[in-house]
From Swiss-Prot:
Phosphoserine: residues bearing it: S247, S324, S351
Swiss-Prot/TrEMBL site (Important for FDH activity and activation by fatty acids) positions: R115
Modified positions (N6-succinyllysine) in chain numbering: K233, K315
An annotated GO BP: fatty acid omega-oxidation
Name recorded for this polypeptide: Alcohol dehydrogenase class-3
Residue intervals passing through the bilayer: none
Keywords of the record: Acetylation, Cytoplasm, Lipid metabolism, Metal-binding, NAD, Oxidoreductase, Phosphoprotein, Zinc
NCBIfam families cross-referenced by the UniProt entry: adh_III_F_hyde (TIGR02818)
Gene behind this protein: Adh5
Pfam family, one: ADH_zinc_N
Reported phenotype of the disruption mutant: Mice develop normally but show a significant increase in whole-cell S-nitrosylation. Mice display increased tissue damage and mortality following endotoxic or bacterial challenge.
Organism: Mus musculus
Amino acid sequence: MANQVIRCKAAVAWEAGKPLSIEEIEVAPPKAHEVRIKILATAVCHTDAYTLSGADPEGCFPVILGHEGAGIVESVGEGVTKLKAGDTVIPLYIPQCGECKFCLNPKTNLCQKIRVTQGKGLMPDGTSRFTCKGKSVFHFMGTSTFSEYTVVADISVAKIDPSAPLDKVCLLGCGISTGYGAAVNTAKVEPGSTCAVFGLGGVGLAVIMGCKVAGASRIIGIDINKDKFAKAKEFGASECISPQDFSKSIQEVLVEMTDGGVDYSFECIGNVKVMRSALEAAHKGWGVSVVVGVAASGEEISTRPFQLVTGRTWKGTAFGGWKSVESVPKLVSEYMSKKIKVDEFVTGNLSFDQINQAFDLMHSGDSIRTVLKM
């Protein structure tokens, strides 16, 4: 099948705001420096829902969404040397070419090699590998895992341990890696420190896990949904609070609880007002606040400059700061050796045909991650 078009099932988003439609699509063979992957498991993430809602200015339709997946290489295009058919892989929405100035700088993981075409929903040569009913269908985040087969750039693939369970490690393609890395890479949480985590969804739980692994002595979880508190404590939160239980601002509450503020705070929602609260809950002189959640396009953050003048640091993170191709295999190994949790993030499994139900579960707040088995 290597040089053949493959016909398979995919969940196509024909237009914004409508449920996904399971369709038969054609997936063209990989061109030079591309890899065609048989996806075996994929999860549903808020970023998929954000684009589907129509709020994403980079959103193009029709499109095949999905960016938390895992599978097996079916075939490779010309010039691909590091991957071969049969390899077990995780597609990556942040590539690692190893050559651009971003890849060569140890301070960042934001490879820019294919950023422009990826943002337009196209492969690096400016075209799509997907067609459905005679129409070209856009790619998404360079991954498009809501399809039985997908084509990705060879710099957007992590080769992983073939014994890893794909219906679990697919989550390392986004949420878990993002939250865990926000704590250990971006904030560089220190042993004995105090942390506050705003938003206790999948990413927030991964931040808590990262703070715990880094040796934080006190981790405060913050969410308006108290149903999430028990799970947060399982992951390592020392205590959990809801802003709705207090008459004063949540930052004032935290400053009082912690004798001046926390050493590290993390915003895992994408709400600019909460980002401000997280910064202002950080300790004067040394507190660090990390923006992990992605706010809607056009939103702006604000605080009084005095907050920064008096020694607080405001940072942001994408994919937890991990250089993707080299780091994801290591994260899989950390999971296999039980250093990090993954299974505990999976709150349910559904068949691929039930993908819209997985979105409903996510919106209800009742699930952390639902994994679809292809």
